[in-house]
């Protein structure tokens, strides 16, 4: 993302293209596999409307997308979002403006259906269906694994976090504890998770 308000209109396209080139260069550097491995896997498809948008968007363009077409999985992903590089002030401002998208005040039945559909997709793609023995299993992907636990917490957070800001924890363990405290999770299940 870049903050288009910092640049005069007459150089906007030039600035936008520079940010796109820079984003591509950074992506290549951190994804490149060397003898030591790679820095970090990034997937530029995980951005607003990836088939038609550039890899680096203006803040206003991104906000417009999320306000009009953002999906439940994107809301869940932004629960954990934080600024980590670049213009931290602009990044924080973007995340603050995004809060109404993430945390809706009213119960969102479409989000509940989306969550159910995502869960079914995860189950269908589960490569390790037998979790009875953890030996040799991918603890992230098995049923009841890390992804399931995160998904459980984020789904509850999306459903109720717009009306109860105590549920807006970005760390999964903290979120589970708050969900238990607020009655969304039984304490014995908290211990198991």
Residue ranges and their predicted role:
Residues 1-193:
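A nucleotide- and high-energy phosphate-metabolite-utilizing enzyme signature
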């Amino acid at each position: 993302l870049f903050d288009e308000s910092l640049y005069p209109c007459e150089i906007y396209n030039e600035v936008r293209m520079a940010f796109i080139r820079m984003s591509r260069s950074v992506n290549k550097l951190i994804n490149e596999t060397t003898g030591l491995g790679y820095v970090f896997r990034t997937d530029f498809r995980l951005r607003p409307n990836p088939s038609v948008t550039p890899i680096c968007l203006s803040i206003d363009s991104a906000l417009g997308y999320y306000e009009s077409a953002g999906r439940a999985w994107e809301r869940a992903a932004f629960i954990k979002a934080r600024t980590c590089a670049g213009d931290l002030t602009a990044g924080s401002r973007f995340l603050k403006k995004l809060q109404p998208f993430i945390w809706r005040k009213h119960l969102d039945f479409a989000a509940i259906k989306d969550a159910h559909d995502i869960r079914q997709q995860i189950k269908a793609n589960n490569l390790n269906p037998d979790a009875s023995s953890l030996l040799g299993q991918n603890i992230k992907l098995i049923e009841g694994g890390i992804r399931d636990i995160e998904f459980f917490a984020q789904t509850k957070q999306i459903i109720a976090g717009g009306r109860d800001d105590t549920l807006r924890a970005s760390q999964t363990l903290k979120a589970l504890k708050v969900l238990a405290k607020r009655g969304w999770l039984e304490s014995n299940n908290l211990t198991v998770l």
